[in-house]
Amino acid sequence: MPQTLGFRELGQMAYEPVWQAMQRFTNERGTDAPDEVWLVQHPPVFTQGQAGKAEHLLLPGDIPVVQVDRGGQVTYHGPGQLVAYLLLDVRRLGFGVRDLVNRMEHCLIELLASYGVPAAAKPDAPGVYVNGAKIASLGLRIRHGCSFHGLALNVDMDLQPFRRINPCGYAGLAMTQLSDHAGPIEFAEVSARLRAQLVKHLDYAEQTTLTGGID
């Protein structure tokens, strides 16, 4: 099994080109292809998962809605939210889907604890919560034993668009963000801590930064 996990720092990019690129990456990867994690912020967009229902889109307004191929219901992405797309050969890693979700949740819980923010997962509602308010969302797709999509952590963003939807299909679900609990946040530092936690919880020995585009 590879010992180094590669990360691509994409900055801010529109949702659909990144989604299309991760589909291509997953469809074309061979059995020896190294795993990658793509870190990105998106301009405002609602994404509707495969289980999504139209009634959970309350008032999208001027924010585009994209129907996507991950699990779960509707969520919102916007600037100030750290999104990590996990392009992993989970069969090679020996992870089941529930195991991978648990690892992602523990990764986020430990990251938040490093800022002094106690968080927890819920057995019936994937994601990570602080005092009952959701701070991170998870959504995955597994194809040919490989994962894509991933997690979204609210760092320091405008949470108002979440009021235009029932987040993850839950009416009235409160949303929160790291900056509300830990004060001023350096986004790059959150990204660095997330990288370290992913390496740890995905059982890698080290990490590297990958260069080049995703086209």
UniProtKB/Swiss-Prot annotation:
Signal peptide: none annotated. Pathway: Protein modification; protein lipoylation via endogenous pathway; protein N(6)-(lipoyl)lysine from octanoyl-[acyl-carrier-protein]: step 1/2. Its main location: cytoplasm. Residues 31-206 form the BPL/LPL catalytic domain. It is found in: Cytoplasm. Substrate binds at residues 70-77, 137-139, 150-152. In the reaction, the free carboxyl group of octanoic acid is attached via an amide linkage to the epsilon-amino group of a specific lysine residue of lipoyl domains of lipoate-dependent enzymes. Belongs to the LipB family. Catalyzes the transfer of endogenously produced octanoic acid from octanoyl-acyl-carrier-protein onto the lipoyl domains of lipoate-dependent enzymes. Lipoyl-ACP can also act as a substrate although octanoyl-ACP is likely to be the physiological substrate. NCBIfam families: lipB (TIGR00214), PRK14342.1 (NF010922). This is Octanoyltransferase. It comes from Pseudomonas fluorescens (strain ATCC BAA-477 / NRRL B-23932 / Pf-5).
